[in-house]
Amino acid sequence: MVKVNENYLKLKAGYLFPEISKRVNNYTQANSSSKVIKLGIGDVTEPLPKACVKAMGEALNEMGTNNGFKGYGPEQGYGWLREKISVNDFISRGCQISSEEIFVSDGSKCDSSNILDILGSDNLIAVTDPVYPVYVDTNVMTGRTGETLQNGTYQGLVYLAINEENKFQPEIPKKKVDIVYLCFPNNPTGATITKQELKKWVDYAIENKSLILFDAAYEAFIQDKNIPHSIYEIEGAKNCAIEFRSFSKNAGFTGVRCAYTVIPKNLSGQNSKGDKIDLWSLWNRRQCTKFNGVSYIVQRGAEAVYSSQGKKEVNSLIDFYMKNAEIMQNKLRSAGFKVYGGDNAPYVWIKVPDRMTSWDFFDYLLEKADVVGTPGSGFGLAGEGYFRLSAFNSRMNVNNAMERIINI
């Protein structure tokens, strides 16, 4: 009989969001008249920018003509999109990232998982706690984490707690780690990092020859001009960091699928003999073997994000969701909750009432207010006692959900 990858058996009972869906489905089946408002999964709700819809429509029509038809595209992405990304997202901020260093993909979730294909399995990995579950689970699946401990953590990972005490800023590891996952603006806490703090991480990585995997999926929601949008705003980062970006949240592409990963050409690792190996070439080889590229139609839609109309419409979407976050902050604070995040990210991170666990509070909100959020413990041991609410919803739903919560 065929043997399975037993690393999958080390995973916790279920990925966080399917577990939430299961509980909500059980509740709605038992309470058919309930009108549940979901502020849990970070999926967008508002329509795509008109500029993107128009561009994709035109691209679709092109595909129906002999002259305009496109077959397989470049695995790295079309040059015209990569150039727009380079100029608008990096060079405009003083980051010297060339179009060749940008790889277009169908999602940063996929890329942050697939990047492990080019990294050795014996690297020591550090993650924040709480953390986006994908970082941990994909390392478990590939056998990099060791055994599961009784408290639900993994023997082979280094956990960097982020909490009220350290203002949700992970401390630099006391020992050398090979790979560090950083996500700012942070999912799930909504915290941000200053240039000064990020510089400490870059300095650590250079000194220890470590690699930073920097998830900037929520950078478009930054309101504070002093907060960095990219790790490449920090001197030296091109020698130690890979950055993941996405069109999912800023342009509403969760159902369209387009993202990109930046791998600087001078970024390198080493083989077992100690020889330098450049990571750009490995990732390019990986993509050419395992990926056929993002569709032409979708890439034209992504290109439209950088048009003058597209920029206005994307900014309007961001303003809409950030207003939702502001409403949530104000209402929850007026009800006596401790609230974090929501200033530069579309998530608010709240302290649950005393003597309640995160899952207790989940059930409490569901049963008393018909509101769904995400238990902090689902993001890691240090997330216990917290709860995430997402600003990705309609204004009416956000207002109604807040009224329900404060009137419990």
Swiss-Prot record:
Q: Which residues are involved in binding pyridoxal 5'-phosphate?
A: 72, 108-109, 132, 187, 218, 246-248, 257, 292
Report a single Gene Ontology molecular function. L,L-diaminopimelate aminotransferase activity
Tell me the superkingdom of the source.
Bacteria
GO BP terms: namely: lysine biosynthetic process via diaminopimelate, diaminopimelate-aminotransferase pathway
User: What EC number(s) are associated with this protein in UniProt?
Assistant: 2.6.1.83
Organism, per UniProt?
Prochlorococcus marinus subsp. pastoris (strain CCMP1986 / NIES-2087 / MED4)
Identify this protein by name.
LL-diaminopimelate aminotransferase
* Top-level EC class: transferase
Entry keyword annotation includes Nuclease: no
Cite the binding residues for substrate.
15, 42, 109, 132, 187, 292, 388
**Reaction(s) catalysed (UniProt annotation):** (2S,6S)-2,6-diaminopimelate + 2-oxoglutarate = (S)-2,3,4,5-tetrahydrodipicolinate + L-glutamate + H2O + H(+)
In terms of InterPro entries, this protein maps to: Aminotransferase_I/II_large, DapL/ALD1, PyrdxlP-dep_Trfase, PyrdxlP-dep_Trfase_major, PyrdxlP-dep_Trfase_small
